[in-house]
């Protein structure tokens, strides 16, 4: 199959539009129209992304509380926990075919993504470590951290491909210039109204701009992320 790769970048979009585009691209990879896609995006409106389901019910009370605080609410059919999206957080989705004949290995898929992101941070002179981050929102074993503080959260889904095989959706949320105390507020509010007692703390998170003197533009950071993916591809 001839490689058909695609790069899509949105510097200021809405969560709804980003996820609609992601779903469209997943279908194109599943049907072999594309070999792989890198989707990079940042929102223009503060939005709390909520996993759909009984654990996280969307109530009028929750919607009103978020709206009063200046946050939109978006519910989508995924696992995990609430994730805040604001300008100053870069998101990436890497959609690709898992190698044929190789059993899907979730640990390898996560570590591949973490390796690419490690290259991205190395380009900026920043050292990161991969581990869980207690008291962070949507905590996971494959967070990237600077000095024990979370800077990236990751997620993974595997989907079936037309004609057999598997497609991987690898996702990451990268804190660039977000106010960590403000972004945890809607998560705490959601936990409280949905009956969860998770202790979410702002100070266990850290944005990139606290660790570098330059302030690269979103376009520049998108380019460096793309470069990290290309560098990783050459070493495969």
Where in the sequence are the language-model features?
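N-terminal lobe of the biotin/lipoate ligase/transferase fold
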Residues: 1-103
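Short secondary-structure junctions
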Residues: 7-9, 73, 126-131, 234-236
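Beta-rich nucleic-acid/ligand-interaction surfaces
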Residues: 130-151, 155-159
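Contiguous, small/hydrophobic- and glycine-enriched helical/loop subdomains that border
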Residues: 89-134
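Generic non-transmembrane alpha-helical segments
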Residues: 61-65, 69, 116-124, 224-232
């Amino acid at each position: 199959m001839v490689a058909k790769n695609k790069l899509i970048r949105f510097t200021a979009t809405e969560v709804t539009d980003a996820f609609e585009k992601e779903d469209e691209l997943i279908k194109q990879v599943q049907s072999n129209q594309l070999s792989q896609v890198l989707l990079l995006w940042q929102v223009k409106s503060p939005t709390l992304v909520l996993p759909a389901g009984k654990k996280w019910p969307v109530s009028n009370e929750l919607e009103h509380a978020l709206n009063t605080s200046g946050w939109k609410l978006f519910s989508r059919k995924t696992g995990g926990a609430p994730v805040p999206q604001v300008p100053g957080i870069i998101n990436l989705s890497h959609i690709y075919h898992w190698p044929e004949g190789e059993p899907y290995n979730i640990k390898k898929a996560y570590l591949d993504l973490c390796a690419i992101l490690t290259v991205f941070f190395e380009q900026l002179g920043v050292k990161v470590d991969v581990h869980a981050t207690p008291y962070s929102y949507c905590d996971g074993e494959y967070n990237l951290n600077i000095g024990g503080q979370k800077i990236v959260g990751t997620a993974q889904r595997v989907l079936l491909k037309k004609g057999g095989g598997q497609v991987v959706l690898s996702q990451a949320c990268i804190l660039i210039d977000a106010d960590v105390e403000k972004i945890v507020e809607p998560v705490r509010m959601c936990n409280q109204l949905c009956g969860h007692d998770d202790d979410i703390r702002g100070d266990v998170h850290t944005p990139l701009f606290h660790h570098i003197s330059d302030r690269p533009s979103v376009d520049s950071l998108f380019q460096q992320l793309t470069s990290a993916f290309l560098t990783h591809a050459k070493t495969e």
